[in-house]
Amino acid sequence: TGWIGGSDGTILKTSNTGSNWSPQTTNTTSPVYSLNFTNENTGWAVGYQGLIRYTTNGGTNWVNQTSPNSSWLYSVQFINSTTGYAAGTTGTILRTTNSGLNWLQQVTGIGDNMYGLHFPSPLTGYSVGTTGRIIKTTNGGLTIIEPIGNEVPADFSLKQNYPNPFNP
């Protein structure tokens, strides 16, 4: 099962690896930029001007959840059935710990648009944005670590490790 979002509130669902797509009723005309499902029934959609929609029946019905601001939301990821994150314009990172009943703004201290996020573990997460910006958290989004730099070294050198037992 898979879902895609698009303009005019479009959400499409496939149950046969993309051979056929069925439109879902979203009750919005706002663009949908990202979707994330924790199982085949429960998922979230985010998009234009703080759009957050939630389904518990595989996308048959979508209900509104309230965003704390009107930032455009470009990415959403839930790490379990209750804890999730959304990233958007002007450094917006939102966090919920109750399946989206309440979304709280996280302090990032940056103004760049954040276009993607990924949590490889419940506490460690990354978000990427404009100008190569990457930010990281190691405590589940409660605080953001100083943004990871985007500087590229001018040059580098690799020297022989002598004596090298693997390359006599």
Regions from the language model: what does each represent?
Residues 1-145:
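Residue-level hotspots at or immediately adjacent to binding/recognition sites across diverse folds
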Residues 163-168:
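Short, solvent-exposed loop/linker segments at the N-terminal edge
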Residues 139-161:
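Residue-level detector of functionally pivotal "anchor" positions at catalytic/ligand-binding pockets or at interdomain
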Residues 41, 123, 156, 160-162:
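Solvent-exposed, flexible loop/coil residues
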